[in-house]
Amino acid sequence: YNGGDYPLHQKKELTSQILVLKKKNIKASDYAKRTIDELFPKNVLENTILKQASISESVIAINDGNGNYTIKILPPQVQFSCICGIQCLDVNKDGNLDLVMAGNNFEFKPQYSRLDANYGNVLLGDGKLGFKWQNYSDSGFFIRNEVKHLEVIKDKKGNEFIIAAINNDTPKLYRLNEK
């Protein structure tokens, strides 16, 4: 912002954990206007480990078998929230692997808002590592909850189901189509 790096966290949150800032006894109004360079002593910044993310989209990493990976960005429809559960299986029994995904995270602090725009996604594979998103009405997979995990299970007759583990709620069960 304005050519400077500003803290993302609120003053109370940082001063409760970083003694250097607590000792400065900065007013909240002053804290809001100061850059990272103005808040922290030079020696603290010089000893800071800086990490940088270069990909912010949801992706899959495809291993070529020799430890080399190709990154494929998933379709725009799955980019609206986090993905916490994913299963790779042949949903439509065409011989190609498909992806079933769900997610959301309601545990963020209020200033960041919650990630709640993932309603579950089915991506049909084309056999060439391309995936096409399916409408909810076509896939039958629609789940607005905070899904923490997806698992494929079978009943005694061999019918396949996807069970979604939902935070603070009962699991949901989805039967896969037979073809």
What are the functions of these language-model segments?
Residues 1-179:
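Beta-propeller-forming repeat regions
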